[in-house]
Amino acid sequence: MLDKTKQIWFIGIKGTGMASLALILHDLGYKVAGSDIDKYTFTQDPLEAAGIEVASFSKDNIKESGQVIVKGNAFKSDNIEVAACEEKGVKWQSYPDTVEEIVQQYTSIGVAGSHGKTSTTGLLATVLGEAAPTSFLIGDGMGKGVKDSRFFVYEADEYRRHFLAYHPDYQIMTNVDFDHPDYFKDRDDYASAFQTAADQTKKGLFVWGDDERLQKIHPKTAKKYTYGLKDSDDFQAFDVVKTTEGAKFHVRANGEDLGEFTIHLFGDHNVMNATAVIAIAFTEGIDLDVVRKGLVKYTGAKRRFSEKDFGDTVVIDDYAHHPTELRATIQAARQKFPDRKLVTIFQPHTYSRTKEFEEEYVEILKGVDKAFLTPIYGSAREAAGDIKSEDIASQIPGAEVIDFDNLKDLLAYKGDCIVFMGAGDIPKYEVAFEEMLGK
């Protein structure tokens, strides 16, 4: 249990969710510190800015009293601090269980789904924050705790069924599209986790109406609402106009036109994400003009279509690593930069996922003007596999595998839209390329 008289020590504090949670608890008046690998990660910047200690792993960090230990999901007994807890008889609590403590203190809204969680959570937090004090936990390393909050908005990760620790008032489910083949047995096993999460939702479940798996999910207690583009949806987006500045659209609820809304986000998926946010706000009785203000204010999450200009060259960084996410990112780039050639640098993420979706990756990357792939990014669980990036590139006309030794080949595409996509260390390639552009 969280305790303000004790230090809250995070094992793995630089993980995206852990960093967000540490920031929230710090804002709420807890004494927060933690440890992680020494290698730089972008999540440490807000931690350091908040004055939160980030130490190296050491058994000496674990005290026999005076601490509440929060353990990151990735760390097992082979971690020196987890081992120290076991040796000293010090109990720890998991990241999901700690988040659940916060969930129960406020009107809570979880955002689940195979794709779109981070962007939708950020958008929802911004909109609700315009209406009332709102704490939030976002999977891009950002978190904020606001005392006397009315709302708590959080990203609910389905991996290893972590989100089943939560019992929110409301939940958005953006889609159910098979992922994490290293853990889930098959598509039915994956979907069953979302059914359980729906059963644990108390008041309202908001699902994308076009998703076949979500159509089959029926919560035990909460009322189910659909959002989408169809007349049959409870919250229907219509008269959608997409431009190089974003999108404008109307939303209909119970036959009533709620008026026009504007977002400075790109791609069909973001219209759907915004409609889900509008549905939550409408259900909670929030003034729609306040909702409009929040929608316009939000410009995106970290590593979600993050855009930089280098003269006439546009560089975009995106977390996309699942086929559905690649499609959405490519569509968004085409929408915003219709007159530029589209060059993609994709880093496949984990061998099991790459093998599972090989055919889809080939199909998608055939649709860009020039496709590059970096070597596959493995994981602690999968250090090697029986597929490599060359296997994908060989099936795509003109595609190449790129690494740091031939990264300069990208300079031939100055003036184009260059998109780096992946969930591993693809930002290292982007930074190296940007340094070349700056010379």
UniProtKB/Swiss-Prot annotation:
SUPFAM superfamilies: MurCD N-terminal domain, MurD-like peptide ligases, catalytic domain, MurD-like peptide ligases, peptide-binding domain. ATP binds at residues 113-119. One of its GO terms (biological process) is peptidoglycan biosynthetic process. Keywords: ATP-binding, Cell cycle, Cell division, Cell shape, Cell wall biogenesis/degradation, Cytoplasm, Ligase, Nucleotide-binding, Peptidoglycan synthesis. It comes from the Bacteria. Pfam families: Mur_ligase (PF01225), Mur_ligase_C (PF02875), Mur_ligase_M (PF08245). It catalyses: UDP-N-acetyl-alpha-D-muramate + L-alanine + ATP = UDP-N-acetyl-alpha-D-muramoyl-L-alanine + ADP + phosphate + H(+). Its EC number is 6.3.2.8. Pathway: Cell wall biogenesis; peptidoglycan biosynthesis. GO terms for cellular component: cytoplasm. It is found in: Cytoplasm. InterPro entries: Mur-like_cat_sf, Mur_ligase_C, Mur_ligase_C_dom_sf, Mur_ligase_cen, Mur_ligase_N, MurCDEF_pg_biosynth, UDP-N-AcMur_Ala_ligase_MurC. GO terms for molecular function: ATP binding; UDP-N-acetylmuramate-L-alanine ligase activity. Gene3D superfamilies: Mur ligase, C-terminal domain (3.90.190.20), Mur-like, catalytic domain (3.40.1190.10), NAD(P)-binding Rossmann-like Domain (3.40.50.720). Its main location: cytoplasm. NCBIfam families: murC (TIGR01082). Cell wall formation. Belongs to the MurCDEF family. HAMAP family: MurC. This is UDP-N-acetylmuramate--L-alanine ligase. It comes from Lactobacillus delbrueckii subsp. bulgaricus (strain ATCC 11842 / DSM 20081 / BCRC 10696 / JCM 1002 / NBRC 13953 / NCIMB 11778 / NCTC 12712 / WDCM 00102 / Lb 14). The lineage of its organism: Bacteria, Bacillati, Bacillota, Bacilli, Lactobacillales.
